[in-house]
């Protein structure tokens, strides 16, 4: 039963990518239902990182590039309470979308709740090296999302599934502070069937922003494999929001001259009516697995099934809000 407090507290929710922003909005709405005050900010930097951001040297990142402006526009359109940089008031709790780069103005004496966004990058020799050298000052963000959670600076870490709880514990996170809540946007795949989208019975190709974050992407090889695996099928493309569209679409047109190409539109309705997903490293592969449709991925599908986010009918945001409330 919903328990509403009479002395609500101030909670700062730090957004990031569009997915993270939508997750935070859902969590904030649940906190408001509990009687607390949810304040939002797009991701922001401090210190030397602020100077680098001002110079445009961090625009390649997903949380500080184009998606930061999209996050701000989304917050504006929702009419939620905002406090850019969390500077206007003292907060009783902070909800983080990542701990790879933590603003240095966050209050150290209040609880921090970290929320898993989705799929993490594969663990590599380099990412393990970064983690080992972190104690000597090497920043965790250099390991990308494979190092999520390893700052250890959070009070609770809300994760997608029991499989992920085990995964993060194996990576070195404190298991006693990890809570399996499910994660918003990936906890109710069946609902996608009800969303409106004009096309039906197609193969949906979900590309990733590997090149934009300086990873290897043999894009033309991937596109040829998609073509060869799906002869005669209707193909629809959904580009990652962080991708350079002109380049990506030019490559697609070489093999798929008439295929629809989307980028800014939400992927969920497209997934709900697809017959198959072709992915690179997209977290959205989880939705295809939850729906039971065929999927391909650069990642190990058996491992993805082990990590599959809880399907709890969309209760994850409320679960996370309850974790926050217990700390207030």
Where are these regions (language model features)?
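Nucleotide-activated donor-dependent transferases that construct or modify glycoconjugates
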Residues: 4-18, 205
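Conserved catalytic-core segment of nucleotide-activated headgroup transferases in glycan assembly
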Residues: 22-24, 30, 185-251
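Catalytic donor nucleotide-activated moiety binding site of glycosyltransferases and closely related
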Residues: 44, 55-62, 230-264
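Active-site regions of enzymes building and remodeling cell-envelope glycoconjugates
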Residues: 55-62, 108-115, 175, 252-262, ...
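A donor-sugar binding/catalytic signature common to diverse glycosyltransferases
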Residues: 96, 263-309
């Amino acid at each position: 039963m919903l328990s509403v407090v009479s002395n609500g507290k101030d909670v700062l929710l730090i957004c990031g990518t569009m997915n993270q922003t939508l997750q935070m909005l859902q969590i904030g709405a649940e906190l408001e239902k509990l009687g607390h005050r949810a304040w939002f900010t797009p991701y922001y930097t401090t210190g030397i990182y602020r100077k680098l951001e001002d110079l445009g040297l961090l625009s390649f990142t997903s949380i500080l590039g184009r998606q930061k402006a999209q996050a701000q526009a989304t917050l504006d359109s929702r009419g939620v309470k905002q406090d850019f940089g969390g500077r206007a008031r003292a907060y009783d709790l902070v909800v983080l979308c990542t701990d790879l780069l933590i603003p240095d103005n966050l209050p150290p004496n209040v609880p921090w709740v970290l929320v898993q966004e989705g799929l993490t990058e594969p663990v590599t020799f380099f990412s393990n090296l970064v983690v080992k050298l972190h104690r000597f000052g090497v920043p965790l963000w250099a390991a990308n999302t494979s190092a999520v959670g390893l700052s250890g600076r959070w009070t609770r870490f809300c994760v997608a599934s029991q499989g992920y709880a085990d995964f993060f514990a194996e990576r070195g996170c404190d298991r006693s502070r990890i809570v399996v809540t499910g994660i918003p946007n990936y906890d109710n795949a069946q609902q996608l069937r009800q969303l409106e989208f004009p096309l039906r019975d197609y193969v949906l190709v979900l590309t990733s922003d590997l090149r934009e974050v300086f990873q290897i992407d043999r894009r033309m090889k991937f596109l040829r494999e998609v073509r060869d695996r799906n002869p005669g099928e209707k193909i629809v493309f959904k580009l990652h929001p962080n991708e350079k569209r002109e380049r990506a679409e030019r490559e697609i047109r070489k093999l798929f001259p008439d295929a629809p190409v989307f980028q800014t539109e939400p992927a969920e309705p497209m997934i709900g009516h697809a017959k198959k997903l072709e992915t690179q490293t997209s977290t959205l592969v989880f939705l295809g697995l939850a729906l039971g449709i065929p999927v391909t991925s650069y990642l190990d599908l058996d491992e993805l099934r082990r990590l599959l986010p809880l399907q709890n009918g969309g209760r994850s945001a409320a679960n996370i809000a309850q974790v926050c409330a217990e700390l207030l």
